[in-house]
């Protein structure tokens, strides 16, 4: 095989392109290296949201969707779109797995868990409403809804809207009621902070909340009086306490896996030891989508789509060595999601996980673990082992979600020196670099419509910076074009399954 030019892909998570705004952390940051590289090399912007990545119109992108599209080299129709279509066409209520769960609940109860918002990143309220209606129509006698509040992929204090819409749906379904409310910070942790998950678990399983309210709206009002935004609302029981009983059925309505896994482990894994608690013997426990190989025994309503000849698989088939590296918060994205939602590690694929700092929120340590990630990248480049290195820097997204503007500025400033070290090392090794992002976030830190911090993702385009030979970047691209561009940089033909195209016109 001819000599392959090594490449480095840097994914700056949540680092969107936006030219205006006093609330743009990137514009306010001191990033001389980033500015110089943009001037010196070929720079463009690409699409990372909506139909360009297999999402509905108006829906911003996210890390899972972004890395799926990047790794696949094609538009991947997302689960939210598949489920939306089934609801619209009337097929949702006849889904075999959902039917099984409702059947099992006829003599007991059906528990519906999920993130209640229209954020569209981890879940969508419309799916929860549709399941409530389906269960009512199927004659399920007791339908219990456990709502996780958002405030991260939605404005920090927006849950009133979603709770009111849930109340409207419940009003049409006399067998259903809301029984618990808690913020996603507790119920949807993904960093093994079991001290967060435990109070949410005890509320769900034993009906023992830290607080109690008669309605979801009352619970929210009390939480706001405690100065808790939606994400941080503490475990609150609603109405008469409800316990999960042996034989009950449960459906977890989050379609994104990473923040649903820990709670699912606590509820279903006999070997779970994160904390001591009663574990119900469910008659049926289903998940809306696959939560991964470790949960393969659980029924799934929407099985994953098989992606053949994505970037990782294709490089492996060519006998090339590749490295994936990220800190904890984004490690699943450069591995599991980049590989098309597959747990498999391909031959020749190495992985490095750098622990994220143990802080309550990342505005308290905006540099996160970027320095250590960079150390590992530089060492990997200098080792000469790898033809391709794929890295995610979490800062822009994780600190952007905090809504703290000054911290977001520091977060992206911390990346500037990291970028310089990576680029210098790769150029010295005779390689080339591509810098992009999976979606926007920290380029918009204030929500003018709601007059509060902007903590969610955006639909803005993202950077596409090629550092190597003289070139121009073609306009109109999207995340699906990143892998074909990398293959062009390496001098390799792209597989037929990749429908994206290289955006780099070498001069």
Curated annotation (Swiss-Prot):
<feature type="binding site">
    <location>
        <position position="401"/>
    </location>
    <ligand>
        <name>Mn(2+) 1</name>
    </ligand>
</feature>
<comment type="similarity">
    <text>Belongs to the BPG-independent phosphoglycerate mutase family.</text>
</comment>
<feature type="active site" description="Phosphoserine intermediate">
    <location>
        <position position="63"/>
    </location>
</feature>
<dbReference type="InterPro" id="IPR006124">
    <property type="entry name" value="Metalloenzyme"/>
</dbReference>
<keyword id="KW-0413">Isomerase</keyword>
<dbReference type="GO" id="GO:0006096">
    <property type="term" value="P:glycolytic process"/>
</dbReference>
<protein>
    <recommendedName>
        <fullName>2,3-bisphosphoglycerate-independent phosphoglycerate mutase</fullName>
        <ecNumber>5.4.2.12</ecNumber>
    </recommendedName>
</protein>
<dbReference type="InterPro" id="IPR036646">
    <property type="entry name" value="PGAM_B_sf"/>
</dbReference>
<feature type="binding site">
    <location>
        <position position="13"/>
    </location>
    <ligand>
        <name>Mn(2+) 2</name>
    </ligand>
</feature>
<feature type="binding site">
    <location>
        <position position="457"/>
    </location>
    <ligand>
        <name>Mn(2+) 1</name>
    </ligand>
</feature>
<feature type="binding site">
    <location>
        <begin position="256"/>
        <end position="259"/>
    </location>
    <ligand>
        <name>substrate</name>
    </ligand>
</feature>
<feature type="binding site">
    <location>
        <position position="190"/>
    </location>
    <ligand>
        <name>substrate</name>
    </ligand>
</feature>
<dbReference type="GO" id="GO:0030145">
    <property type="term" value="F:manganese ion binding"/>
</dbReference>
<dbReference type="GO" id="GO:0006007">
    <property type="term" value="P:glucose catabolic process"/>
</dbReference>
<dbReference type="InterPro" id="IPR017850">
    <property type="entry name" value="Alkaline_phosphatase_core_sf"/>
</dbReference>
<dbReference type="InterPro" id="IPR011258">
    <property type="entry name" value="BPG-indep_PGM_N"/>
</dbReference>
<dbReference type="InterPro" id="IPR005995">
    <property type="entry name" value="Pgm_bpd_ind"/>
</dbReference>
<keyword id="KW-0324">Glycolysis</keyword>
<keyword id="KW-0464">Manganese</keyword>
<feature type="binding site">
    <location>
        <position position="439"/>
    </location>
    <ligand>
        <name>Mn(2+) 2</name>
    </ligand>
</feature>
<dbReference type="GO" id="GO:0005829">
    <property type="term" value="C:cytosol"/>
</dbReference>
<feature type="binding site">
    <location>
        <position position="122"/>
    </location>
    <ligand>
        <name>substrate</name>
    </ligand>
</feature>
<keyword id="KW-0479">Metal-binding</keyword>
<feature type="binding site">
    <location>
        <position position="63"/>
    </location>
    <ligand>
        <name>Mn(2+) 2</name>
    </ligand>
</feature>
<feature type="binding site">
    <location>
        <position position="330"/>
    </location>
    <ligand>
        <name>substrate</name>
    </ligand>
</feature>
<feature type="binding site">
    <location>
        <position position="184"/>
    </location>
    <ligand>
        <name>substrate</name>
    </ligand>
</feature>
<comment type="function">
    <text>Catalyzes the interconversion of 2-phosphoglycerate and 3-phosphoglycerate.</text>
</comment>
<dbReference type="GO" id="GO:0004619">
    <property type="term" value="F:phosphoglycerate mutase activity"/>
</dbReference>
<dbReference type="Pfam" id="PF01676">
    <property type="entry name" value="Metalloenzyme"/>
</dbReference>
<feature type="binding site">
    <location>
        <position position="438"/>
    </location>
    <ligand>
        <name>Mn(2+) 2</name>
    </ligand>
</feature>
<comment type="subunit">
    <text>Monomer.</text>
</comment>
<comment type="pathway">
    <text>Carbohydrate degradation; glycolysis; pyruvate from D-glyceraldehyde 3-phosphate: step 3/5.</text>
</comment>
<feature type="binding site">
    <location>
        <begin position="152"/>
        <end position="153"/>
    </location>
    <ligand>
        <name>substrate</name>
    </ligand>
</feature>
<feature type="binding site">
    <location>
        <position position="397"/>
    </location>
    <ligand>
        <name>Mn(2+) 1</name>
    </ligand>
</feature>
<dbReference type="Pfam" id="PF06415">
    <property type="entry name" value="iPGM_N"/>
</dbReference>
């Amino acid at each position: 095989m001819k000599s392959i030019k090594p490449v480095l892909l840097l994914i700056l998570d949540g680092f969107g392109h936006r030219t205006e705004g006093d609330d743009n952390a990137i514009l306010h940051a001191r990033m001389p290296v980033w500015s110089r590289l943009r001037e010196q090399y070929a720079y463009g912007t690409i699409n990372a949201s909506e139909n360009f990545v297999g999402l509905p119109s108006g829906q911003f992108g996210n890390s899972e969707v972004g890395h799926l599209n990047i790794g696949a080299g094609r538009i991947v129709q997302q689960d939210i779109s598949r489920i939306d279509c089934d609801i619209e066409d009337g097929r949702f209520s006849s889904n075999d797995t959902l039917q099984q769960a409702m059947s099992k609940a006829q003599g007991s109860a059906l528990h519906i868990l999920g993130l209640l918002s229209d954020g569209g990143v981890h879940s969508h309220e419309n799916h929860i409403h549709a399941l409530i209606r389906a269960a009512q129509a199927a004659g399920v006698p007791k339908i219990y809804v456990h709502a996780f509040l958002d405030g991260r992929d939605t404005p920090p204090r927006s849950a009133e809207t979603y709770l009111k819409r849930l109340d409207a749906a419940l009003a049409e379904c006399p067998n259903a009621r809301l029984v618990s409310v808690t913020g996603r910070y507790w119920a949807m942790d993904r960093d093994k902070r079991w001290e967060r998950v435990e109070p949410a678990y005890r509320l769900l399983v034993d009906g023992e909340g830290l607080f109690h309210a008669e309605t979801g709206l009352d619970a929210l009002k009390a939480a706001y009086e405690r100065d808790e935004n939606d994400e941080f609302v503490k475990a609150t029981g609603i109405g008469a306490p409800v316990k999960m009983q042996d034989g009950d059925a449960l459906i977890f309505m989050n379609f994104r896996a990473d923040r649903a896994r820990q709670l699912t482990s606590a509820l279903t894994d006999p070997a779970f030891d994160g904390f001591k608690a009663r574990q119900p013997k469910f008659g049926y426990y289903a998940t809306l989508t696959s939560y991964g190989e470790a949960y393969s025994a659980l029924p799934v309503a929407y099985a994953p789509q098989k992606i053949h000849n994505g970037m990782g698989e294709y490089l492996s088939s060519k006998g090339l060595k590749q490295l994936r590296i990220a800190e904890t918060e984004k490690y699943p994205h450069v591995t599991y999601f980049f590989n098309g939602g597959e747990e498999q590690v391909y031959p020749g694929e190495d992985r490095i996980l750098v622990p994220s700092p143990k802080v309550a929120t990342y505005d308290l340590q905006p540099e996160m673990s970027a320095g250590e990630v960079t150390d590992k990248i530089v060492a990997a480049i200098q080792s000469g082992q790898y033809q391709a290195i794929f890295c995610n820097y979490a800062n822009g997204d994780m600190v952007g979600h905090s809504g703290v503007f000054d911290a977001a500025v520091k977060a992206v400033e911390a990346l500037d020196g990291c970028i310089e070290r990576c680029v210098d090392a790769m150029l010295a090794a005779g390689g080339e670099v591509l810098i992009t992002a999976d979606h926007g976030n920290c380029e918009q830190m204030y929500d003018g419509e709601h007059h509060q911090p902007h903590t969610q993702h955006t639909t803005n385009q993202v950077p596409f910076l090629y550092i190597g030979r003289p070139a121009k970047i073609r306009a109109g691209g999207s995340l699906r074009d990143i892998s074909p561009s990398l293959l062009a940089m390496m001098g390799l033909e792209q597989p037929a399954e990749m429908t994206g195209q290289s955006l780099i016109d070498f001069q």
